[in-house]
């Protein structure tokens, strides 16, 4: 399975790639890691393929006289036209994507890169400490990734280790029964409730795992989700 780890800056993508790939290896799987972030100084793990061995954001800035944002866009265009190793003998290949999500998600490059791989899915990470009061916004962002990249996308809430047990259980309740817990008290709340109802009409509800990329909490559930996506007979709800 080719697993692309997406998410906003600071959501914990690289740490998840590092520790989830180590977890899979301990479970007996052949795992490879791929770093597609040309701007990172140190991802914290040794990737089996690292785009920085070919170019970096800094090298593009020097070569073309671009600023950081222009260099990132150029890097994404180069990535889209590259042949990325597929590591055919691996059970799972975990891809670390750029820290700045927008150029990857909202330009054609991201779809072209991911579209070059069969048997694929996306893990879309969110920072629980920043999102626990805006879970609908996070879910809509993950849904955007699903539409844009045309790939099965699992929304994952990271950093559960930074919540108290009571806070974590409160988030789980919201994830399990968002409509029951939504009590419109203003225009924004009413809009949120109606959006939730509309989404549930067209998209079957899926699990939203709460994980910790740091401690490994929730990794077993992520592996189960990979099984279910792979066999197409599983139940993601």
Locations of regions flagged by a protein language model:
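Long, contiguous binding/interaction regions
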Residues: 145-148
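Nucleotide-state-sensitive switch-loop elements of NTP-binding domains
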Residues: 1-6, 11, 15-112, 118-121
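Active-site glycine-centered loops adjacent to acidic/histidine catalytic or metal-binding residues
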Residues: 37, 156-158
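Hydrophobic beta-strand scaffold residues
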Residues: 31, 153-155
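Conserved strand-to-helix beginnings and helix N-cap segments that scaffold or border functional pockets
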Residues: 17-18, 106-108, 135-139, 220-223
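Well-ordered, non-membrane alpha-helical segments in soluble/globular domains
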Residues: 133-142, 188-193
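Conserved Switch II/interswitch segment of TRAFAC-class P-loop GTPases
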Residues: 92, 97-106, 118-139, 150-153, ...
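Canonical P-loop GTPase G-domain recognition
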Residues: 152, 161-237
């Amino acid at each position: 399975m080719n697993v692309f780890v997406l998410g906003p800056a600071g959501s914990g993508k690289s740490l998840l790639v590092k520790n989830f790939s180590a977890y899979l290896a301990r479970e007996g799987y052949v795992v490879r890691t791929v770093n597609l972030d040309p701007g990172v100084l140190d991802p914290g793990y040794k990737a089996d393929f690292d785009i920085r061995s070919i170019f970096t954001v800094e090298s593009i800035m020097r070569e073309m006289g671009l600023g950081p944002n222009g260099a990132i866009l150029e890097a994404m265009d180069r990535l889209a036209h590259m042949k990325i190793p597929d590591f055919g003998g691996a059970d799972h290949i975990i891809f670390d994507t750029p820290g700045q999500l927008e150029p990857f998600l909202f330009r054609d490059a991201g779809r072209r890169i991911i579209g070059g791989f069969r048997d694929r899915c996306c893990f879309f990470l969110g920072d629980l400490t920043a999102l626990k009061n805006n879970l609908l916004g996070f879910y809509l962002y993950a849904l955007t990734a699903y539409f844009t990249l045309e790939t099965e996308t699992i929304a994952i809430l990271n950093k559960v280790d930074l919540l108290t047990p009571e806070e974590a259980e409160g988030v789980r309740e919201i994830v399990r029964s968002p409509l029951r817990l939504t009590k419109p008290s203003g225009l924004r709340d009413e809009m949120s409730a109606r959006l939730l109802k509309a989404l549930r009409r067209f998209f079957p509800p899926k699990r939203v795992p709460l994980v910790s990329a740091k401690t490994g909490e929730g990794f077993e559930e992520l592996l189960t989700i990979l099984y279910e996506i792979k066999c197409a007979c599983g139940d993601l709800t």
